[in-house]
């Protein structure tokens, strides 16, 4: 099988770039234009080609893609351009960006420039900055040639990086990278836009029903005016003050200054949802119900993606996107956490359709983090509880409350569940207190009580604590 290392250079501008748009939006845009492409077949000299779309397509057609692996740095981008714009689909996909995340971690810096510097394999140029806002007709012949040298250098750096990273990289992981990229580049799922349009209409109707009841009280003429007043932090704070309530404040993580604590997970806002004045409770409920929700944004995104891709739904997942090695969401969507319990919100998941003669199997690993942790640490009592099918959450909750807890005690069991899933990974008292208070169904415990619970967990799960210490020593 041949190895083809490739890098596309494409038009971008202030309002049209991968920082403004998702990868899918950028490539599907009418503004999309290839300036040129650098290609290296095996160990042959790297070539640069620039021309019209038809010219580039003819140039790419000379390669035997059916017996070639494609190598890029961010193959999700270049591979999608090949497939969507030039109908080229190689036999196998390789990606040094994915490989670097697995080798160096998600926070190590995965840009080609940083990795080239790390391995001392050469320097990445800066010509791409000078190309901003230039379409192919805007380049002089000398500028285009210089841009070509920049692109060819990127191709050479990518191959050198691959040769280093692949020396001990398992084939099984390369197969996972290939599979992950194919889910995006060569999508097979279809989207049921009719189901999504219906659910989107229901959401909007529900929101306007909420808004209609507040028009007179807030002295607004339209539902849209109510929505804007409640959605704006500044205007919502003003409404609270007009009704004798001081808006809750917090320290901004970005500026360090005081700002309104009106996000749905802010403790100050959560306290307002149970305010003694029912009208304040209603204001908070309507604010939560009328602000653009994750569900609404996702539905609109699914519909627009499907429309641009002839009903198909590319699945963008980031290989080794989390510290644990798990996949992460990408392109402003995460297909790993689509709602599954709420019947109405399940529209998102139900709208993902299998192609003809196939079915979708919906599955999930139950309590996987807690199970693997107990097994890895050798916490045999907890492993045995899982093996027996015991309710591990209720068992620990029973220790906390010193009485038998079952599923008939939803709040207490919620506390036990939160502890089992969080305390095993180092959660402390303050974090536990915040999580219990802000996550539904919610439990308001003092910091001192949370400290007692943390100590109880660590005293009764000594093998897990030892695993932490052993891990620290190895690091």
Name each model-derived stretch.
Residues 1-15, 21, 29-38, 107, ...:
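Conserved "right-hand" nucleotidyltransferase catalytic core of DNA-directed polymerases
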Residues 6, 72-73, 94-97, 352-368, ...:
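Conserved catalytic palm subdomain of right-hand nucleotidyl-transferase polymerases, strongest
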Residues 22-25, 33-34, 362, 369-402:
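Metal-dependent catalytic core segments for phosphate chemistry
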Residues 32-39, 43-57, 63-166, 173, ...:
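Active-site-proximal helix-loop-helix substrate-binding element of RNase H-like nuclease domains
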Residues 64-70, 226, 357-361:
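Short active-site oxyanion
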Residues 76-87, 101-103, 236-244, 366-380, ...:
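Short active-site loop/helix that positions an aromatic residue
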Residues 90-91, 208, 245-251, 377-388:
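Cytochrome P450 catalytic domain signature, combining two hallmark sequence patches
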Residues 407-426:
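Amphipathic, charged-and-aliphatic alpha-helical interface segments
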């Amino acid at each position: 099988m041949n190895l083809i290392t490739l890098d596309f250079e494409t038009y971008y501008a202030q309002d049209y770039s991968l920082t403004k748009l998702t990868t899918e939006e950028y490539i599907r845009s009418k503004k999309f234009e290839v300036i040129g492409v650098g290609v290296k077949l095996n160990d042959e000299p790297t070539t640069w080609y620039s021309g019209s779309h038809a010219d580039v397509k003819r140039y790419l057609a000379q390669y035997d893609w059916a017996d070639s692996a494609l190598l890029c740095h961010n193959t999700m981008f270049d591979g999608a351009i090949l497939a969507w714009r030039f109908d080229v689909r190689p036999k196998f996909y390789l990606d040094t960006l994915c490989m670097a995340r697995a080798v160096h971690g998600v926070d190590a810096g995965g840009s080609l420039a940083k990795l080239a510097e790390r391995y001392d394999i050469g320097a990445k140029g800066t010509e791409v900055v000078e190309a901003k806002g230039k379409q192919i007709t805007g380049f002089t012949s000398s500028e285009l040639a210089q841009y070509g040298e920049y692109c060819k250098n990127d191709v050479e750096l990518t191959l050198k990086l691959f040769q280093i990273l692949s020396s001990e990289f398992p084939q099984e992981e390369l197969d996972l990278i290939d599979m992950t990229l194919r889910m995006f580049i060569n999508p097979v799922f279809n989207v049921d836009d009719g189901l999504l349009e219906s659910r989107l209409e229901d959401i909007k109707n529900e929101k306007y029903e909420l808004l209609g009841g507040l028009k007179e009280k807030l002295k607004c003429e339209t539902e849209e005016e109510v929505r804007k007043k409640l959605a704006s932090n500044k205007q919502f704070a003003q409404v609270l003050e007009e009704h004798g309530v001081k808006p809750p404040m917090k320290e901004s993580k970005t500026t360090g200054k005081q700002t309104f604590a009106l996000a749905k997970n802010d403790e100050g806002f959560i306290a307002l949802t149970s305010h003694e004045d029912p009208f304040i409770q209603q204001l908070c409920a309507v604010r939560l119900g009328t602000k653009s929700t994750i569900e609404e944004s996702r539905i609109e995104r699914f519909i627009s993606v499907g429309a641009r891709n002839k009903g198909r739904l590319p699945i963008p997942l980031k290989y080794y996107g989390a510290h644990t090695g798990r996949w992460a969401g990408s392109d402003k969507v995460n297909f790993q956490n689509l709602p599954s319990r709420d019947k109405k919100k399940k529209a998102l998941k139900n709208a993902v359709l299998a192609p003809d003669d196939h079915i979708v199997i919906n599955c999930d690993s139950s309590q996987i983090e807690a199970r693997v942790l107990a097994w890895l640490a050798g916490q045999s009592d907890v492993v045995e509880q899982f093996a027996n099918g015991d309710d591990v959450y209720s068992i620990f909750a029973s220790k906390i409350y010193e009485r038998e807890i079952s599923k008939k005690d939803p709040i207490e069991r919620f506390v036990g569940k939160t502890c089992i899933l969080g305390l095993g990974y180092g959660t402390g008292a303050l974090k536990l207190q915040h999580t219990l208070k802000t996550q539904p169904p919610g439990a308001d415990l003092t910091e001192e009580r949370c400290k007692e619970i943390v100590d109880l967990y660590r005293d009764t799960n000594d093998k897990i604590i030892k695993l932490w210490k052993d891990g620290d020593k190895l690091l």
